[in-house]
Design a protein with these regions (language model features):
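The conserved acidic donor/metal-binding loop of glycosyltransferases
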Residues: 1-4
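Conserved core of the sugar-phosphate nucleotidyltransferase
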Residues: 6-93
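Conserved alpha/beta core of the MobA/IspD/sugar-nucleotide pyrophosphorylase nucleotidyltransferase superfamily
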Residues: 67-136
Length: 136
């Protein structure tokens, strides 16, 4: 698990998204810390007014400078039929370029609804991340 600090409340926040019948994919985001802006292992996301992800990227230059960016927490929930649909999708260029599976879904027009947590969760994506966690 690369998200060892997830708690029950974080899972519940994603589950709560599904009270809206239009939600087919849910995920968790948190405020982006300044120290993470240039870290390519931290996936950034911007959202619209309905908390639907507009774009995911490892790099800040992919976003409009005026838009607020969030840190993506790598956990998803899906409706069963959506999961079967996602399995059938073709890989996209942006997914391959950034190594982010969620770009395939965005490229194929699936909405990813985001729940915001104020918790700054530490993900383990690199050896540096692991060392940081082991020092805690």
């Amino acid at each position: 698990c690369d998200e060892p600090f997830l708690k029950k409340i974080h899972f519940q926040k994603i589950i709560d998204l599904f009270s809206n019948k239009n939600v087919v994919i849910g995920t968790l985001i948190s405020p982006l810390e300044t120290e993470d802006l240039n870290d390519s292992s931290v996936v950034k996301v911007n959202i619209n007014e309905k908390c639907i992800a507009k774009q995911f990227s490892r790099f800040t230059n992919k976003f409009n400078k005026r838009e607020k960016l969030y840190k993506h927490i790598g956990i998803y929930a899906y409706r069963k039929d959506t999961l079967f649909s996602l399995k059938q999708l073709e890989v996209t260029k942006s997914e391959l370029t950034e190594s982010l599976e969620q770009l395939r879904w965005v490229d194929h027009n699936f909405n990813i609804h985001c729940s915001i947590t104020s918790d700054n969760l530490i993900s383990i994506n690199t050896k540096t991340d692991l060392k940081k966690v082991l020092k805690m």
